[in-house]
Amino acid sequence: MKCLCFIVLLAIVIAQSYVGVEAAPSDGFVSRNGVQFILNGKPFYANGFNAYWLAYEATDPTTRFKITNVFQNATSLGLTIARTWGFRDGAIYRALQTAPGSYDEQTFQGLDFVIAEAKRIGIKLIILLVNNWDDYGGKKQYVDWARSKGEVVSSNDDFYRNPVIKDFYKNHVKTVLNRVNTFTKVAYKDEPAIMAWQLMNEPRCGVDKSGKTLMDWINEMAPFVKSVDPNHLLSTGHEGFYGDSSPERKNSLNPVSANTVGADFIANHNIDAIDFASMHCGSDLWFQRLDQNSRLAFIKRWLEGHIEDAQNILKKPVILAEFGLGSDTPRYTLANRDGVFTTTYDIIYASAQKGGSAAGALFWEVISEGMSNFAGPSSIILSDKSSTVNIISEHARKMGLLGETTRK
């Protein structure tokens, strides 16, 4: 009996490890026309979520079912996009890039699986190429690598200026984009299941508050990414903080602390190689002490300002790539979280309904069942029958109907 149970278990593990090998019916690349995304000649809306952990869990074949569950639950609710990490740098468990130019093949196959499974189930991916923060390596790891090779660096923001570090980043871009998926046999740069790349998660450069250093880096790296991969859309990974190019917005919309981070929402997105604008709305992080009414008022001003600027100045789509309300926020209630989701979605829908620049919203964050080790204050399990999940599903339904109406 024990032997039979072991054989059955082994068969399940093997089956799970090969989920996603069969490709779904062919699907096109997401492109853009003015302020709208286009898929197979029709308008496309980015309704989705963040799940940074996908490649990490997919590195172990016995836990790949978690990726399958999340994608299946997402599509059952009408969600279309998952935003996830395409990096994990340094001497950490399940690192992707263990040293400059050195990659762990098992971890890379985890990312292969995520892409293959997204393709099979019908999810588009937005993949980030490095982190601003120290988590999972980030720009600090790149700077440490350079220092170990004798480079004179004084801060983590030398990531943007040091030529050796910039070459490390470019090599990572080439390695990831040219990677041939071991499941689908398709190079990432040729894979339609990938919607877009983002240069960095939440780029900031505090040592140069003028914004010039970060702007120079984007001006160099965005065309470089496009030279390697002209098929996919590209954005910055920006939080949406305004800079010196729009002083009125900077003074009226930015959290005060954001005025020193060297980012510029308008300038950083106003180049040809950047296809769409990115913003986040971390009202729970930026304004811990706001009451609910004040929080919702800020969200309205923040989103409507960026949507207006994407429409009239950038003339590109804008994605709200992170939003939510953490349970660790002072005076948190589920009703308050639902209020944040409802207000956010209503503003996105109002723009999309008019053919405006708001192309979708991705909440932070989704986890799968049984992932208590990854659970955070903002984690949502899509299979839960919570009021928040109902709001997510209803918004996806409305945006889907809007897309169908627009296509006629």
From Swiss-Prot:
One CC-aspect GO term: extracellular region
UniProt-listed Enzyme Commission number(s): 3.2.1.78
Residues modified by glycosylation: 73
Catalysed reactions listed for this entry: Random hydrolysis of (1->4)-beta-D-mannosidic linkages in mannans, galactomannans and glucomannans
One protein family per Pfam: Cellulase
GO molecular function, one term: mannan endo-1,4-beta-mannosidase activity
Any one Gene Ontology BP term: polysaccharide catabolic process
Family: Belongs to the glycosyl hydrolase 5 (cellulase A) family.
UniProt protein name: Putative mannan endo-1,4-beta-mannosidase 4
Organism: Arabidopsis thaliana
Lineage: Eukaryota, Viridiplantae, Streptophyta, Embryophyta, Tracheophyta
